[in-house]
């Protein structure tokens, strides 16, 4: 199970939400009460974790929304393969390939032997940061 559920009113800026099947981080949120008998609405602007696209959602604050479960793990870069890197998990020792991040500063630090923090979000992998210099 890679998602859990929460009400939209409980979420804040910086929280994570699933919009159109994509995991996103909330960057802007506003709530408005509509009229005498209307329910309060929330307008959410979020950025997709994998593509960087902006997505919006307008719904009642008591609406149930999906929240992605983010598994934060540590791995070691084994090989640089162009626009992909091969990573070995430091706990399970399984190896897998991950697309390089779009951030040029982070991308330049990815070399064999470097420890990285990566996230598993809805069955997809993303590298979030480099933990230290390669061990020689």
UniProtKB/Swiss-Prot annotation:
Spans through the membrane: none
NCBIfam families per the UniProt record, alphabetical: eIF_5A (TIGR00037), PRK03999.1 (NF003076)
One Gene Ontology cellular component: cytoplasm
PANTHER family (alphabetical): TRANSLATION INITIATION FACTOR 5A FAMILY MEMBER
Protein known as: Translation initiation factor 5A
InterPro entries attached to this UniProt entry: IF5A-like, IF5A-like_N, NA-bd_OB-fold, Rib_uL2_dom2, Trans_elong_IF5A_hypusine_site, Transl_elong_IF5A_arc, Transl_elong_IF5A_C, Translation_prot_SH3-like_sf
Gene3D superfamilies membership: 2.30.30.30, Nucleic acid-binding proteins (2.40.50.140)
Statement: the UniProt record of this protein carries the keyword Secreted: no
Subcellular location, principal: cytoplasm
Species assigned in the record: Hyperthermus butylicus (strain DSM 5456 / JCM 9403 / PLM1-5)
Top-rank taxon, per record: Archaea
This protein's UniProt keywords: Cytoplasm, Hypusine, Initiation factor, Protein biosynthesis
SMART domains: eIF-5a
GO molecular function annotation: ribosome binding; RNA binding; translation elongation factor activity; translation initiation factor activity
Compartment(s) where it occurs, according to its Swiss-Prot or TrEMBL record: Cytoplasm
Hypusine: residues bearing it: 36
Family label: Belongs to the eIF-5A family.
